[in-house]
Amino acid sequence: MQREYHRWWSKDLNRDMELLCFGHAGTKVLVFPTSQGRFFEYEDNGMVGNLADRIDSGQLQLYCVDSVDGESWYNKHAHPYWRVQRHMQYERYIVDDVLALMWKKNQTPRLIATGCSFGAYQAANFGFRHPDAVTGIVTMGGAFDMKDFVDGWYSEDFYFNNPPDYLANCTDPWKYNHIRTVLATGEWDMCWEKNERFATILRNKGIRHELYVWGDRSFHDWPWWKPMARMYLE
């Protein structure tokens, strides 16, 4: 399997950022880590190996990015305004640097944003904010409402980074018609209800999506996200 490590200075974040790329061709997959996770966690938790046959055959090419969650949403020492601003800087880094690298290496127009747990929020928010850049959103065990991270504070910038809010008021849902959106959760997943609520918002706006609730005592952890990735990342 082709594996590449990249590190460079991000002007948007004013710090070095790292990522891992797996594969040589195929649908590009932008992988966001879990809460305060690192760029290597997808590999360390067996998700890359889980998809090895598709990566080796040129079906998928993974780009596993780092997070700055500890500087943004999880930074309780900062005012919520600055948490949101740091998140927006992170998004600009993804657009300016990561998407540019992806396009340089692979010109296929197919791009799936994916993530587990907190990474599911990142994937969904990025995909719905940038429908021109993605063709798929695959979330596993996701929670999508960020109000718990801002201590009752609210602003326009927060609104436009909180998918349940801006999608509930969406007046042009047609712009998402080309995106295959998958919400995967489990009957023992602590985020099951959050997926149901988010799916209701999408359904009410006519935004195409698929909600899958796995049985067999499936809950919020890697052993269940692995088969979900096998099922929905293609």
Residue ranges and their predicted role:
Residues 1-234:
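Non-catalytic cap/lid and distal C-terminal segments of serine-dependent acyl enzymes
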